[in-house]
Amino acid sequence: MSACSDFVEHIWKPGSCKNCFCLRSDHQLTAGHPKARASSLPAGARLPARPEICRLEDEGVNGLAYSKPTIAVKPTMMTSETADLWTEASLSAEVPKVNWRRTPGKLLLQKQEDGPIVYLGSFRGMQKAAGPLACTDSNSRCPPAYTMVGLHNLEARVDRNTALQPVNFQEEKAGREELPSAQESFRQKLAAFTGMTSSCLKGPRPCTSPQPLRESLPSEDDSDQRCSPSGDSEGGEYCSILDCRPESRDAVHNTEGSGRRRGDCSPICWEQGTCTRPTEEEKQALNFPRECCGQGSTANPPHLGPKKPSLNSEAASSSDGLSCGSSRSGANSPFAPHLENDYCSLVKEPTSVKQQDSGCHLVNSGKYVGQAVDLQPPALPREAVQPEPIYAESAKRKKAAPVPQRPEPKKEQVSSGQVWTGDTWSQKTPSGWSQEREGPNAAPQVATTITVIAAHPEEDHRTIYLSSPDSAVGVQWPRGSLNQDLHGSGEEPLVVQGLSSRESHPHNMTENSSKEKPAIPPKLSKSSPGGSPVSPAAPPLTDHSDGNTSGSSVGSQPSSRVPTNLTSSCQTNGVAAGDPAKCPPQANSSVLDQRRPRYQTGAWSRQCRIEEEEEVGQELLSQSWGRELENGIADHSNSSTWHRLHPIDGASGQNGKTNSGMSKSASFAFEFPKDRGRLESFSPPPPPPKSRHLLKMNKSSSDLEKVSQSSAESLSPSFRGAHVSFTTGSTDSLASDSRTCSDGGPSCEATHSPTISGKKLFAPVPFPSGSTEDVSPSGPAQPPPLPQKKIVSRAASSPDGFFWTQGSPKPRTASPKLNLSHSETNVCAHDEPPLSYSLNSGNHPHHVFSSSEPLEKAFKGSVPWAPALGPANSKGGCGSPNLQGRAATSTSSSQLSVSSQASTGSSQLQLHSLLSSISSKEGTYAKLGGLYTQSLARLVTKCEDLFMGGLKTELRFDENSWSLFKLICNKPCCDSGDAIYYGATCSKDPDSIYAVKICKTPEPKSASYCSPSVPVHFNIQQDCGHFVASVPSSMLAFPDTSSKDPAPAAPSHTPAQEQDCVVVITREVPHQTASDFVRDSVASHRAEPEVYERRVCFLLLQLCNGLEHLKEHGIIHRDLCLENLLLVHCNPQSSPGPSANPSVPTTTSRCPSAAPAATTACQGGPGEKHLPRLIISNFLKAKQKPGGTTNLQQKKSQARLAPEIVSASQYRKFDEFQTGILIYELLHQPNPFEVRAQLRERDYRREDLPPLPTLSLYSPGLQQLAHLLLEADPIKRIRIGEAKRVLQCLLWGPRRELVEQPCPSEEVLCNTLHNWIDMKRALMMMKFAEKAVERRRGVELEDWLCCQYLASAEPGALLQSLKLLQLL
């Protein structure tokens, strides 16, 4: 860029500088002093998103030879800040930031012509090699000619003239691994690479100046650098677009689509898509050329040679995300020069580069499987709109570059892009890479990254807008056949091998691509415009870590890991092998992805079309990628947050390995490279593409977002043909799923593609119904079924997504393959198991029978998971009910279908389970007992909802709310020991009745009133707010007078006087206290002792329930007396509403005139139709055990308390004791300690306590319970929980007759009690069934209490209770 200072619109001719349009040879003349380019744009002009675009250019897009692209230069300053973030620069200031990023699919191979060309572009998302090269894998992912990519500006320290020598990546790997640090290796790489860059910057034209390399290496924005690396190694910030061959529109689109879906192309698409959504052709052309260039560089051993040692570091870093040795390295290395030089040297060795490009493409394709990102760029947006221009932005990172040149954005129209013909890209433009060098400024400048956005990959004729901060952005569109390029390069054989291997292993390619792509979709990482470094880094890392990439990038060796046949890969992904366009982009994607990750991370989403974004997204967002990665690349992308590194590990791993990264939870969008050394330069994964990329994606931004969110539902059809199956929600399963669901469809082959096998670690659990797993497109261009999102019932889908995602790696490998359309069938199959398991799964761990789950859920099918459960899961499902449910949900195609199938399938399954041992009485009875237990447990919950109604929600009122209340009657409804209660309504909630509790105690004392800080309970008074208010004296005086006389004069006495009192708002409106109840029921006790005493037992049971709840929270009431126990009308009907309505009249009836009626009802205690609800009130004396406070001072004070005080031993059984006294008082007996004062002065025995008259069968039990509670020794005193169980035994049995047997053994008694419990449960269910069909009989409080008892009863506890009652 520095070489040219002015940009004007020209017709660019092959061989001329794309920035200044002068002969590139002129720029090349001075390697060390690149000609100043047209004035470079200010840094600000660089678009953050452009870095990705720049990346495309970095990737070395070659214009097709036959067409003369017009370049519209648009001054822009691209900032790849995101890339910088991702770039980990341990290098000195000279080497500002070098991201060694190997894109997973990148082939290191360069065209022979381009062999000398080394594109060193830092790759976004690629961190500096951490330790050994990313390609350190045994697989020669990074071919020997492994150029350092992302070594922009590394060359700043190195003479531009230094020629980059292709380095054997494996060799480098060994050497680099030895390097103590990635930085050191990186520096070595930079040095070597800069040398190599100058030498190999241009395949055909030697890189005159290594300085561009340096620039490219240090370029601030790796992703930008990645783009710019396409420039010569010389100091131009020349963005060389190598072998930019837009495939035939169809081919490109197919490639894109297939690549995106397949993953072969998608890496390329990913990269390019990341940057922009150029036509797929363009993507492929742009990205592939990049790769080619990189490969070309690699192909030229002289270039890489110097870098060999550094290449190892590169490999390491590329594994981190830098595609050093990969085709990206090769292709990228040319970019690197561009980055460094900002040079327009589209170093394209017409034959070698292109051939390498082809080779790269092929290899990349295979590699892409390993390195989804790289492959992606070639696979331009598979459905880019042809009419839309391609926007290529070149962003130059100038960290170390002393001269901050700002390349002007250029627009280059490529009449036609590279076309993938069969296995190779045919470049429509034969012209070789124009290797224009910018002036000396280029060297200091950081390599610019060119992002090419192809709106319509299908369009052969594209307008490429190159926006390069460095005015020197060279873009050539040499159009040579991919084969030509492949064969032309000395490394062509390698490329061919890689390609062939891909072709031979198309599935592997696809897998690799998928993995690669997901690794770092630049667009996906919206958060980082320049963040593409991360995403590229991840894909390269993935590829490198997988080792597939290295082979792909450098030669056949890596490609062997990758599927040999791109076509096959495409096929695997749902694209027919015959769809060469799709397959080739895969190869290109490798290369491009390697570069692209740089910009993909950050800027790709901006201008990129959704399709291209999808490609990018495929890596990060499997969904959007899924569309483009119909090959199954989407699998990786399926996790909304593709592990960019995952794709590298997992994506390339998909081919030959399981994706370790993918195996991580899908929720973790970014997976670190397998090699921590690679991670050395690895930057944190870019945040999942969010607003920016997603927003950018016109079609599937929401889809991508959903994918990134790991949405259980499949992405919207916006991803055409992208049926990303997020099998497990884990990246590993994602890859499998995407392939499985490619095309959202039945194409199980795709799902079973090697990608899946690679991910077999986590067998993908497909969400047939459109779970996120389904999002990844396996089909090349087929939009996912529109209903895909909806296919999963919402209930099912949310649980599915979660269940499957969290649930289990145990993937139904077949299921991922299932189309969403098949989901219903699957659901049915799964539905039965869910039912059988549904009973088990519930909240109860009953595994007695599969139907242990709630019948209601199982039969209703309301539980999405129930249908999801498979027959296999029904029994085993007990262990993992959630998983089963999720699986079922995902399988369900629609909520309706799920629920209906759940009801049928579940019921059938449950029935099958229940009838499995129908021949055995014991087995049948055991299952029936379990069913009743589960049913009662559900009934308890339902009754709680019925009786509690809306009481569970806490309300808070303050003094400002006092004016909102209006008394229903001027007479109190209840006078308790501590307060007077009035019924009132609230203007904010006129339908509800509240009680206004006016405390009798003086204001200062009651001001400290506070209700216990415990959860709402049916038997604890709920404090909805208390405050001090001025209350008329008449309201306080009336109760006393009214209790004795009407005293009508009392109100008139002080009508105007007011008194400050503590006012408490409660929801429970009491009609009387227990004291009133006892006083009014003396006659009824004599008349109907059994009825009355039974009611006393119910009141005591409610008291024990409330006290037990308080004790669970460490609260001791300490003031249990009849006056503090309030009775509230409780006669619920079929719904909570009726219970509320009665309270209104009741409250109104509390008016003086109606008081007698209420009293009469209460008086007849036993005669009262409905059992009253007991409320514990007045907590003024309550104590809470110390230790729960968070106040430091209080903790210090408590630390000095004696053990008996801390443990509150004196209060431990305080409430139990007072409960014993209440038994006497409720049975109309005086407090024994009042009658016999001597009992308080000495230790007493049970015999000393006064006896209770035996009036009913409950009397002996109540007396025994009172004695147990009044034990003088607190240690011998029973606890409130035991008292509760004794009361339950008294109320519902078992009776003495049941256990009166001659010397029965305890085991026999337990068996007897177990059978008794089962029988009582069956009778209770029958009672509920009868009440359900009786209009006037609703569930009563007694029924709820009985259900509580029977649901929790067990023989051991019953035996203990019987012993306490002395019935045994």
Swiss-Prot record:
GO molecular function, one term: identical protein binding
InterPro entries: Kinase-like_dom_sf, MitoQC_Scaffold_Kinases, Prot_kinase_dom, Tyr_kinase_AS
PROSITE patterns: PROTEIN_KINASE_DOM, PROTEIN_KINASE_TYR
Record annotation: effect of changing Y391A: Does not affect cytoplasmic localization
Domain of life: Eukaryota
UniProtKB keywords: Cell junction, Cytoplasm, Nucleus, Phosphoprotein
Biased composition (Basic and acidic residues): 502-518
Protein name listed in UniProt: Inactive tyrosine-protein kinase PRAG1
Species classification: Eukaryota, Metazoa, Chordata, Craniata, Vertebrata
